[in-house]
Amino acid sequence: MQKLNKNVYDHYTQYPEKILQFGEGNFLRGFIDWQIDQLNQHTDFNGSVAVVQPRGSEKIKRLNEQDGLYTLFLQGMKDGEAVNEHMIINSISRGIDLFSDYEAYKELASSERLRFIISNTTEAGIVCDEKDRLEDRPQKTFPGKLTAFLYFRYQAFKGDQTKGCVLIPCELIENNGEKLRETVLHYAHLWKLEEGFTQWIHEANTFCNSLVDRIVPGFPVDSIDEITADLGYQDDLIVVGEQYYLWVIEGPDWIGKELPFAAAGLHTKIVSDLTPYRTKKVRILNGAHTAMTPVALLYGLKTVRDAVEHPEVGRFIRELIDDEILPVLKMEGLSQYADDVLNRFKNPYIKHYLESIALNAISKFKTRNLPTLKEYAEQKGQLPERLVFSFSALLYFYHDNETLQDDPAVLQFFKEVWCQEDGDMLRIASRVLGEQRLWGADLNEIPKLTDRVAVYLNHIHELGMQRALEQYCIQGGEVR
């Protein structure tokens, strides 16, 4: 069977490269690149995306073999009806492998048409590595790679103020645009780049905070043979996502003219303050995802839908949202939003594997759940027991688990703690909670948290997750 490429797709169009995208994963292709495809179809945007993979090169190779084309399935409720549709996305021009073709990356920096830079490198992506150097090919971190790219552009156009870029990071961290700009400026200082470059970053470039919302499980592993037979071509880059989506960009109004989302009928907003959008989405949807994942995986479940429809795990998740997340937010319309989120989790078309949510789970908990835990404890004078139970499950999940995908330093830390403390759950809890590099603070200072985590670690270890959760639910969190 022939593989999808421009020879198979009769409507293939080559657009000018206006966007550099860091990340080639399922989410960006099922969310951002789909929207760019919509802009090309319904407006005069006339632009494509050049993709850089932050790590490795295998998917870049597959992208180029398919001429940037891939099939997107959108499944779920649309305008009140269940809709399962698919389309070929024609917005990616090429993938650039930084490890084998760095010169192509440098060359793109001098493109007259390039205007936008978009990224999604997970919550752990916007960081600085003091060992990165401008001379590296490439740098280790995403911001290091980006700083080098912007410096190449600054040099190519001799500091021309009209050749700056609009940068829209999609990483789920607070003030992601501001954090990215700060990290770029840190690299500029670290590398002792001239003051003119720093001034150009400030004056010629626009860094936008943004918030993304769409569940994109990715490649349909379980049904790929049936799908391939129906499509009539082989596609190694199929993406499955839900119908619902929302993109909120905090930035000046003129961005909506350069990226004409409204004219394309897209549900993307340009706003002056995305804080309420972000807080609601990150705390409830992403927070529920991260809280359920270690509990459900240790229980033996595989998908988000399995978890929310399970009698005990589903009840645990619902009560965690209603009794611990919503009360600290103090915003209108939260109950309806929470109901909508749980209905999205139950989407019968979507198989969202919990293992995919477990990627970089420690940094995700810090961003999505730790603020709720702290605020609940401060406001109520007691601990949010379900969230603490989930936190304990997360720490136990990092015990002797070879399937974990996280920063090597994080994995090494947990390996050492679990090995050195030899099952002493109180000492394990104390060491992990005290590791400020993970949490940005010493969590042992939260009253009673260390002891409570140790209690739950003991129960999960001795009873297994099924019995531990059963006892927890029966006794309302008063397990001793």
UniProtKB/Swiss-Prot annotation:
Keywords in alphabetical order: NAD, Oxidoreductase
Induction: Induced by galacturonate, repressed by glucose.
List of residues binding NAD(+): I19, L20, Q21, F22, G23, E24, G25, N26, F27, L28, R29, G30
A GO CC term attached to the entry: cytosol
Enzyme's top EC category: oxidoreductase
Gene Ontology biological process terms, A to Z: D-galacturonate catabolic process; mannitol catabolic process
Pathway involvement of the protein, from the record: Carbohydrate metabolism; pentose and glucuronate interconversion
Reaction(s) this enzyme catalyzes, per UniProt: D-altronate + NAD(+) = keto-D-tagaturonate + NADH + H(+)
Transmembrane segments: none
Superkingdom: Bacteria
Enzyme Commission designation: 1.1.1.58
GO molecular function, one term: mannitol-1-phosphate 5-dehydrogenase activity
Something else known: Member of the exu locus which is required for galacturonate utilization.
Entry's family note: Belongs to the mannitol dehydrogenase family. UxaB subfamily.
Protein's recorded name: Altronate oxidoreductase
Gene for this chain: uxaB
